Amino acid sequence: MARYTGASCRQCRREGMKLFLKGDRCYTDKCAIVKRNYAPGQHGQGRKKVSNYGLQLREKQKVKRIYGVLETQFRNLYERAENMPGKAGENLLSLLERRLDNVVYRMGLASSRKEARQLVTHGHFTLNGNKVDIPSLIVKVGDVIEVKEKSRSSAKFKNLVEVNSRIAPKWLEANVEGMTAKVVGVPTREDIDLEIAEHLIIELYSK
């Protein structure tokens, strides 16, 4: 499955909620959900009754869109979550939260997860002192993520530090001005401030 390259706002309208795909714009009245809170397309305003399978599928698509994950990656994370102690749904969300691109976003050094993914891919970060360019990498407790020394003086990062107002979750010890963060815990369900019914995803994959 190829990565979606269309308008981000259409995805939010399809899911009927803000997915925060466009950074700061999502917090303003310019957000498409504020203007047109119905699905895109000719028949978007007449939402049909959805079957249980449809609900499960929509929930999976929603979470994939929030985190910018493709189907193969998502399936692999689900299988990993199933083999971990505890509830599979909560494990899945915890793994998604610990993706490196999401950690950069949670640090406040990117306006969206999409931008965070691009910054990681372009090699602007180090992990435990080593250059890293894999957005899907899952960080662990004790890992230290930093903006690469050569990138710190760029206008891009200076501006991100100046405008940042995001509060890092408690599992992440972030120093935005220092452009660094340390993973001090594992994300729990209470740490994830997203409207997600993860049990529907588990039900879908369990069939």
UniProtKB/Swiss-Prot annotation:
Residues 98-164 form the S4 RNA-binding domain. GO terms for biological process: ribosomal small subunit biogenesis; translation. Gene3D superfamilies: Ribosomal Protein S4 Delta 41, Chain A, domain 1 (1.10.1050.10), RNA-binding S4 domain (3.10.290.10). The keyword DNA-binding does not apply. Keywords: Ribonucleoprotein, Ribosomal protein, RNA-binding, rRNA-binding. It holds the Pfam family S4. Belongs to the universal ribosomal protein uS4 family. Part of the 30S ribosomal subunit. Contacts protein S5. The interaction surface between S4 and S5 is involved in control of translational fidelity. This is Small ribosomal subunit protein uS4. It comes from Clostridioides difficile (strain 630) (Peptoclostridium difficile). The gene is rpsD.
